[in-house]
């Protein structure tokens, strides 16, 4: 047998015994595959996409986290942390919580854009000159472009422009800044001092499924428990019809839970919303994290009757 044929046979044998993401080709390619996620505050990385990142980590794909603010205006939602010393040092404590969550989830790097939390819409803090809401689009966008050009992600996840269910100024700004950076990072003519151009191949929005909320609500009712989901939340139009991508994160529910609990100032361990159902039941009820593919420079596999199951589809060898 020639070297070429024996080598091809070896690759075929290896590929047939390796799980998804782990063909010989993908073992090599995964080292250079990168996901970049952009979030507004510490704890957002845990409530949106943590299980996906943990799963990618276990398959050798690196993930980069960009957190835009320090969460200084966050309410203390855990009674055990509602103390004067915590309130006086909230910024430092939230940074420590973020560092813990980053390690639990498995992000390779954390970048802080350095803006101050703007607070909920209508608060005086919205108008502070150092708040994220007041940052110029170009200034904040350039910070993100520099990160994109340095880390060279193929996939980027950010927020939907429709934040009607939670119209926080910083969440709205995350969307605008992300779109700006996505559109300019690959343009060689745009500010070469920020690094060599890099075009992100796929841009997603993280999605909160109304169907998921309804499934959890119905299970609470079935078990005779008080549902944490309001009528307004259940009747919200949501964006389920826009969902293109559903990542099966069975086996990673605990990672998401532990990451949430790392944010002790923000997450009450007794919260029915987060932890009202037993872990195994909650994971079986909706074992997915949902996304909306917004822009793609890769070949997409999703269609009207086929949901994408992989953020990197079209970028990996699927044979």
Where are these regions (language model features)?
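Metal-dependent de-N-acetylase/amidase catalytic core
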Residues: 7-10, 17, 21-36, 123-126, ...
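Active-site rim/loop-helix segments in enzyme catalytic domains that contact anionic ligands
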Residues: 21-152, 292-295, 300-303
């Amino acid at each position: 047998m020639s070297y070429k044929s024996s080598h091809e046979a070896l690759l075929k044998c290896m590929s047939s015994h390796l799980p998804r993401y782990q063909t010989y080709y993908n073992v090599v390619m995964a080292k250079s595959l990168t996901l970049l996620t952009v979030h507004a505050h510490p704890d957002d990385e845990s409530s949106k996409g943590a299980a996906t990142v943990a799963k990618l980590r276990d398959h050798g794909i690196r993930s980069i986290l960009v957190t835009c603010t320090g969460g200084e205006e966050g309410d203390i939602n855990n009674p055990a942390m509602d103390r004067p010393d915590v309130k006086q040092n909230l910024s430092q404590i939230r940074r420590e919580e973020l560092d813990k969550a980053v390690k639990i989830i498995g992000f390779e790097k954390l970048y802080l854009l350095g803006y101050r939390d703007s607070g909920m819409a209508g608060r005086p803090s919205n108008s502070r000159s150092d708040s994220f809401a007041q940052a110029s689009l170009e200034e904040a966008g350039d910070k993100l472009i520099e990160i994109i050009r340095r880390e060279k992600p193929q996939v980027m996840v950010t927020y939907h422009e429709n934040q009607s269910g939670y119209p926080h100024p910083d969440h709205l700004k995350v969307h605008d800044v992300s779109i700006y950076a996505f559109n300019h990072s690959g343009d060689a003519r745009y500010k070469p001092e920020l690094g060599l151009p890099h075009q992100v191949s796929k841009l997603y929005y993280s999605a909160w499924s109304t169907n998921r909320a309804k499934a959890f609500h119905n299970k609470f009712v079935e078990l005779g428990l008080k549902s944490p989901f309001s009528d307004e939340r259940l009747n919200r139009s949501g964006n389920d019809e826009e969902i293109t991508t559903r990542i099966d994160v069975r086996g990673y529910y605990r990672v998401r839970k532990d990451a949430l609990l790392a944010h002790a100032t923000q997450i009450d361990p007794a919260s029915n919303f987060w932890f009202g159902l037993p872990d195994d039941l909650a994971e079986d009820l909706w074992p997915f994290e949902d996304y909306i593919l917004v822009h793609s420079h890769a070949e997409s596999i999703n269609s009207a009757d086929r949901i994408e199951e992989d953020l990197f589809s079209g970028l990996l060898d699927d044979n």
